Amino acid sequence: MVYRGFGLEYLSPPEKKAFGELSPDEQGERGAEMVVGFMSSCPGKSVISGATGFALGGVLGLFMASMAYDTPLHTPVPGGMSGAVQQMADLPLRQQVKLQFADMGKRAYSSAKNFGYIGMIYAGVECAVESLRAKNDIYNGITAGCITGGGLAYKSGPQAALVGCAGFAAFSAAIDMYMKSEDGRPPENDFKQ
């Protein structure tokens, strides 16, 4: 028999009710807890980073692809591409626009895939490293950058993997140092009169 007096019943966690037994407010709270729990997990962070990277990469790829058409189509391109450019200029305007939008879509999708892939891998590796080390410091990002950069370049050989590791680690360190630069103590003269 459990003693119920002097507030001792509040020492144990409340009994977990089935979802159907909860009030609408409690169902909303439980749903929000589940969403926050997923977003805080390593797979959740990885999926969110991948989706965000995909969206950002698509916008950036679309912008960069639109810059490829900043010269008139009849202008000769160095390297002997003037024949292909002249053929493009001979097409009707509607066909030219259709081809340009198709090319922009392909470039935007390619950029979106690359950014999404990099974001997903980096976030997953950083979260896993942080979970293994049980620390939140700059070395998690450096390690994740090295693993991500080396992993992306491993098919090109060990030298490329080493350069990718060093490059991603240095970039990650620079970004982390910038982002955490405001976490330090305020300057000595900040609060003096």
UniProtKB/Swiss-Prot annotation:
The chain crosses the membrane at residues 47-67, 138-154, 159-179. One of its GO terms (biological process) is protein insertion into mitochondrial inner membrane. It is found in: Mitochondrion inner membrane. It comes from the Eukaryota. InterPro entries: TIM22 (IPR039175). GO terms for cellular component: TIM22 mitochondrial import inner membrane insertion complex. Keywords: Disulfide bond, Membrane, Mitochondrion, Mitochondrion inner membrane, Protein transport, Translocation, Transmembrane, Transmembrane helix, Transport. It is a multi-pass membrane protein. GO terms for molecular function: mitochondrion targeting sequence binding; protein transmembrane transporter activity; structural molecule activity. Disulfide bonds join C42-C127, C146-C165. The keyword Mitochondrion applies. Component of the TIM22 complex, whose core is composed of TIM22 and TIM54, associated with the 70 kDa heterohexamer composed of TIM9 and TIM10 (or TIM8 and TIM13). Belongs to the Tim17/Tim22/Tim23 family. Essential core component of the TIM22 complex, a complex that mediates the import and insertion of multi-pass transmembrane proteins into the mitochondrial inner membrane. In the TIM22 complex, it constitutes the voltage-activated and signal-gated channel. Forms a twin-pore translocase that uses the membrane potential as external driving force in 2 voltage-dependent steps. This is Mitochondrial import inner membrane translocase subunit TIM22. It comes from Candida glabrata (strain ATCC 2001 / BCRC 20586 / JCM 3761 / NBRC 0622 / NRRL Y-65 / CBS 138).
